[in-house]
C-alpha cells in the first residue's frame, strides 16, 4: 500500500463527516458482534436440548468465561485507544510498538488462564453446586474453554488492531469466520453427528475454541496482508514497559469493569441457586439473549473509540462531541428495540431454549423486569467507552463498580430475603438508574476538564 493511501486511511478519522464515518467503522463490527451473539446463543440452544442440567452447568461456567473475555478484550481496548492516538499524532513507529506489545500481552493472558484450567476449573464449578451431573458437565465445559483459550486472546487482539486503523470490515470478516465455524461444529460435537462421539456440554466447548483459533488465524492473515499502518514483526522485538504502561492506563480499567461482571454473575448464581437450578438457567438464558441488544452497542463502541482517540490526539474537540452524541443516539434506538422484544415476546424467546413449563413461568416475568434497564444501559455503555477513549478509564471503572458490586448484588441479595425470586430481578433496573446518574455527571466533568480547554486552545491559536 502506498504512503498516500495509508495517510488517507488514518486521516479520514480526522476529516470525514462523523455520521458516515461512525457508521462505516461501526456497522461491520455490529454485524460481526451480532453473529458473535448468535453463536453464543446457538451454543446454549443446542446444550438446552441435552437437558436443563447441562444448560445450568454452562451458566455456572460463565463467570470464568467472562473473566477471560475481560482480560482479552480489556487489553485489546487499551491497545486500540493508544494505537489510534499514536496514529492521530503521526507516530507510526510507536503505533507498531503498541501492536506488538499487545500481542505479547495476549500471549501472557492465554498462558495464565491455561494454568487456571489445569488447577482450578473443577473446583470453581464445585464451589457453586453439589449436583453431581451439573458439576461434571460444568467441569468438562470449563476445562476445555480455559486450556485452549489462547485462541480467544489472540483473536480479540488481532481484531482490535484492524479496528484501530479503520479496517473494521476486515475485523468483521475474521470474527465472522470464527463464528460460522463455531455454529457449524456445535451440533456435530454436542450430539455426535457424522461419526463423531457425543460430547454434550464438552462438545460446545470444543466448537467454541475451534472457532476462536480459526478466527485468530484469519485475523493474523488480514493484519499481515492488509494492515499497512502498523508493522508486525518479531525482529528486534522486546516488551516495552513504557508502551505497556500506556496500554494498561486504559486497559486495566476496562479489564476491571468486565472482571467485575464476572464477580457479579458469580454472586448472582449463588443467590439464585438458593431458589433452584432453574433460576440459574433463566439467568444464564437472559445473559445470552441480552447480548443481542448489547453486542451491536459494543460494535458502535469499537467504531467510536478509534475516532475519539484519533481526534483526541489531533486536538479536534467538536468531532469528539459529535461522535459521542451520535453514538448515544444509535445505542438508544437499539436498546428500545431490545426492550420492545423482551416485553412483547418473552415466551417466544425462552421457547427457543427448550424451556420447561417451570422455566417459562419464571423466565417470562424475569425478562420483562430486567429489560426495563435497557434504555438506561445504552447511554451508560457509550459513556463508559468514551471515558476510556479520553484517557479517563477510572471514571468508567467507578461506574461499573458502583453499578454491579455496590448496588446490584446487595440489592439482589436483599430482595432475595423476601423469598420471592421475581423480586430479585428488580435489582437490575435499580442499579442502572444509579449508573445513568453517575455517567451524566462524569460526562459533564469530561466536557469541562478536557473538551472545553481544547476548544479554548483552538480559539487562542486561531487568534494568533
Where are these regions (language model features)?
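Short alpha-helical transmembrane segments in multi-pass integral membrane proteins
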Residues: 1-26, 83-150, 196-252, 308-373, ...
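N-terminal transmembrane alpha-helices
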Residues: 13-45, 49-50, 63-78, 82, ...
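Transmembrane helical elements of multi-pass membrane transporters/channels
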Residues: 23-43, 144, 178, 211-215, ...
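Helix-terminus/linker motif at the lipid-water interface of multi-pass membrane proteins
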Residues: 34, 38-56, 125-132, 188-199, ...
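Small-residue-rich hydrophobic transmembrane alpha-helices
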Residues: 55-115, 152-171, 266-269, 282-340, ...
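Hydrophobic transmembrane alpha-helices of multi-pass small-molecule transporters
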Residues: 67-70, 182-187, 216-220, 292-295, ...
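Short runs within selected transmembrane alpha-helices of multi-pass transporters and secretion channels
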Residues: 76, 80, 145-163, 171-179, ...
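Structural signal for membrane-spanning alpha-helices in multi-pass inner-membrane proteins
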Residues: 117, 160, 186, 190, ...
Amino acid at each position: 500500500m502506498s504512503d498516500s493511501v495509508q495517510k488517507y486511511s488514518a486521516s479520514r478519522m480526522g476529516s470525514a463527516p462523523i455520521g458516515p464515518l461512525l457508521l462505516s467503522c461501526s456497522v461491520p463490527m455490529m454485524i460481526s458482534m451480532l453473529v458473535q451473539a448468535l453463536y453464543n446463543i446457538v451454543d446454549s440452544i443446542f446444550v438446552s436440548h441435552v437437558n436443563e442440567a447441562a444448560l445450568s452447568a454452562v451458566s455456572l461456567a460463565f463467570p470464568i468465561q467472562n473473566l477471560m473475555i475481560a482480560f482479552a478484550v480489556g487489553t485489546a481496548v487499551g491497545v486500540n485507544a493508544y494505537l489510534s492516538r499514536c496514529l492521530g499524532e503521526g507516530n507510526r513507529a510507536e503505533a507498531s510498538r503498541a501492536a506488538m506489545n499487545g500481542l505479547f500481552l495476549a500471549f501472557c493472558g492465554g498462558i495464565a488462564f491455561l494454568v487456571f484450567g489445569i488447577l482450578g476449573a473443577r473446583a470453581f464449578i464445585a464451589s457453586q453446586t453439589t449436583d453431581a451431573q451439573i458439576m461434571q458437565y460444568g467441569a468438562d465445559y470449563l476445562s476445555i474453554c480455559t486450556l485452549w483459550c489462547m485462541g480467544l486472546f489472540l483473536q480479540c487482539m488481532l481484531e482490535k488492531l484492524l479496528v484501530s486503523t479503520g479496517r473494521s470490515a476486515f475485523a468483521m470478516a475474521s470474527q465472522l469466520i470464527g463464528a460460522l465455524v463455531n455454529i457449524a461444529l456445535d451440533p456435530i460435537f454436542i450430539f455426535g453427528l457424522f461419526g463423531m462421539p457425543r460430547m454434550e456440554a464438552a462438545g460446545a466447548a470444543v466448537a467454541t475454541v475451534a472457532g476462536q483459533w480459526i478466527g485468530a488465524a484469519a485475523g493474523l492473515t488480514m493484519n499481515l496482508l492488509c494492515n499497512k499502518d502498523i508493522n508486525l514483526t518479531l525482529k528486534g522485538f522486546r516488551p516495552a514497559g513504557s508502551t505497556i504502561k500506556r496500554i494498561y492506563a486504559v486497559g486495566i480499567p476496562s479489564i476491571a469493569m468486565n472482571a467485575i461482571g464476572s464477580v457479579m454473575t458469580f454472586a448472582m448464581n449463588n443467590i439464585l441457586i438458593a431458589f433452584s437450578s432453574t433460576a440459574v438457567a433463566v439467568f444464564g438464558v437472559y445473559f445470552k439473549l441480552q447480548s443481542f441488544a448489547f453486542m451491536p452497542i459494543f460494535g458502535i463502541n469499537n467504531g467510536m473509540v478509534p475516532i475519539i482517540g484519533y481526534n483526541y490526539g489531533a486536538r479536534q474537540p467538536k468531532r469528539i462531541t459529535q461522535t459521542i452524541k451520535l453514538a448515544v443516539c444509535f445505542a438508544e434506538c437499539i436498546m428500545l428495540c431490545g426492550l420492545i422484544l423482551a416485553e412483547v415476546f418473552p415466551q417466544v424467546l425462552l421457547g427457543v431454549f427448550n424451556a420447561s413449563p417451570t422455566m417459562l413461568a419464571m423466565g417470562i416475568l424475569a425478562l420483562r423486569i430486567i429489560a426495563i434497564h435497557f434504555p438506561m444501559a445504552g447511554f451508560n455503555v457509550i459513556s463508559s467507552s468514551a471515558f476510556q477513549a479520553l484517557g479517563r478509564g477510572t471514571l468508567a471503572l467507578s461506574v461499573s463498580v458502583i453499578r454491579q458490586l455496590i448496588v446490584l448484588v446487595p440489592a439482589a441479595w436483599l430482595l432475595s430475603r423476601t423469598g420471592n425470586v421475581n423480586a430479585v430481578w428488580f435489582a437490575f433496573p435499580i442499579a442502572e438508574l444509579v449508573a445513568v446518574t453517575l455517567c451524566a455527571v462524569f460526562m459533564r466533568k469530561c466536557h469541562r476538564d478536557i473538551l472545553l480547554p481544547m476548544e479554548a486552545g483552538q480559539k487562542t491559536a486561531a487568534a494568533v
